[in-house]
């Protein structure tokens, strides 16, 4: 997978919250659920005062909060670790969920702040019981259309995103492949160490060369 496509996976999930404003195909409850946090995201991105460097921490905290409301990071973690999830202790599971959520939230914010006027249009929505898929296409400023599907499920009293599929590539499957490779060639403890290092580098805006765990 190319770096551009890897970055696009997280960018697409980030854009889900700031681009779901126009209507293409008729929107149903899952799409409506995604819309709930849109106004606050747009407000944070469009507020000149909040965009000031001195308020960076506040702005990013707001955007991370929105991401946390829209995505089911625990479910994403379970699916990404797959068979390795059940072999972990409750304490290890809790730690990894937090590490994965932190990495995703920070990646989400860093990509979201690169938003450059892309548009989105809906191509459909399907719901089967407590599972749903919202199908969209992101339209770049050059007119290129990128198909993006948001896989969601019903949890408690709302729909939450547990995977993003861009051009047929699943964000969760991408991480699952990386996690499997690291655990297979090294150890679970090494994976945790890399997750911690990656989270720090994303927080500091550092681009790592030749490092695994690329979103």
Name each region found by the language model.
Residues 166-215:
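Low-complexity, intrinsically disordered terminal/linker segments enriched in charged
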Residues 1-12:
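Bacterial N-terminal signal peptides that target proteins for export
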Residues 105-146, 198-215:
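Surface-exposed, charged secondary-structure patches
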Residues 47-54, 58, 87-91, 114-117, ...:
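Surface-exposed, polar/charged faces of alpha-helical domains
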Residues 10-20:
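Bacterial N-terminal signal peptides
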Residues 29-104:
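Early exported N-terminus immediately downstream of N-terminal targeting peptides
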Residues 145-173:
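Short beta-strand edge/turn micro-motifs at domain boundaries
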Residues 24-27:
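Boundary at the C-terminal end of the N-terminal hydrophobic targeting segment
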């Amino acid at each position: 997978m190319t770096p551009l496509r890897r970055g696009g996976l997280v960018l697409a999930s980030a854009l889900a919250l700031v681009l779901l404003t126009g209507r293409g195909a008729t929107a149903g409850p899952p799409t409506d659920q995604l819309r709930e946090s849109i106004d606050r995201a747009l407000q944070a991105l469009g507020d000149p005062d909040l965009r000031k460097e001195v308020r960076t921490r506040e702005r990013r905290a707001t955007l991370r909060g929105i991401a946390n409301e829209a995505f089911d990071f625990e479910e994403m973690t379970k699916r990404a670790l797959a068979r390795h999830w059940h072999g972990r202790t409750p304490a290890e599971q809790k730690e990894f969920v937090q590490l994965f959520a932190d990495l995703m939230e920070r990646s989400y914010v860093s990509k979201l702040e690169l938003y450059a006027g892309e548009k989105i249009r809906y191509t459909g929505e399907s719901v089967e019981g407590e599972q749903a898929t919202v199908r969209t296409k992101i339209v770049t400023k050059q007119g290129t259309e990128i198909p993006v599907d948001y896989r969601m499920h019903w949890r408690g009293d709302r729909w939450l995103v547990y995977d993003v599929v861009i051009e047929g590539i699943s964000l969760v499957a991408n991480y699952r492949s990386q996690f499997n490779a690291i655990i297979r060639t090294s150890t679970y403890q090494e994976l945790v160490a890399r997750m911690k290092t990656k989270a720090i580098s994303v927080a500091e805006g550092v681009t790592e060369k030749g490092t695994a765990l690329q979103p």
